[in-house]
Amino acid sequence: MNVLPCSINTLKGLYDLSGVEVGQHFYWQIGGFQVHAQVLITSWVVIAILLGSATIAVRNPQTIPTKSQNFFEYVLEFIRDLSKTQIGEDYGPWVPFIGTMFLFIFVSNWSGALLPRKIVQLPHGELAAPTNDINTTVALALPTSVAYFYAGLTKKGLGYFGKYIQPTPILLPINILEDFTKPLSLSFRLFGNILADELVVVVLVSLVPLVVPIPVMFLGLFTSGIQALIFATLAAAYIGESMEGHH
């Protein structure tokens, strides 16, 4: 007799839970749209850091490289090796894409831990890593999905779609679903890990003295770098898979 009221209360509870936000957020009202200002501000800082670093890297190259030039060359070589390992011999055109993804995510993740959050006073909330917002991670995953299809169609033409009926046509729905779940897994993995890391640090800082959370902060820096590497590696692997065939 009480099943219906309980079901209604459960649905109401789930609806209320769906409106919960983690922390306070500051929005800009532009026309009829709400823009997440915290994400934009930190993203602009990250982009400025990357553009400034790229300008320094190519401004005055030396025959005998300096320490900074050695560092940038090492980063480029690392990205090239990563792309070649996952994509294969046709990795060249994809190095800029994989490199952009890796560097933006890496610097974004670290910005949440290293940039002083009080450096910019906001009416609500504080600055945080762009990647702790689901909109950012989805925006990074969708171009990866587009690149995945583009690489396969460029290499194989319409024959690319034949992979969906391999090894048997019965697997057609599963193979189609697999392609749509790849960007979801990329975005939610990155979002969940970065958000959880920042929440743990915030809670520890509020509960205990500053010295105690420092090891956790260093662990967060390490895991942030690992998350950037995982995202870039999976993106390159998906592109390589679409060019080589179904696995």
UniProtKB/Swiss-Prot annotation:
Disulfide bonds: none annotated. Keywords: ATP synthesis, CF(0), Chloroplast, Hydrogen ion transport, Ion transport, Membrane, Plastid, Thylakoid, Transmembrane, Transmembrane helix, Transport. SUPFAM superfamilies: F1F0 ATP synthase subunit A (SSF81336). One of its GO terms (cellular component) is proton-transporting ATP synthase complex. The chain crosses the membrane at residues 38-58, 95-115, 134-154, 199-219, 220-240. It comes from the Eukaryota. F-type ATPases have 2 components, CF(1) - the catalytic core - and CF(0) - the membrane proton channel. CF(1) has five subunits: alpha(3), beta(3), gamma(1), delta(1), epsilon(1). CF(0) has four main subunits: a, b, b' and c. This is ATP synthase subunit a, chloroplastic. It comes from Drimys granadensis.
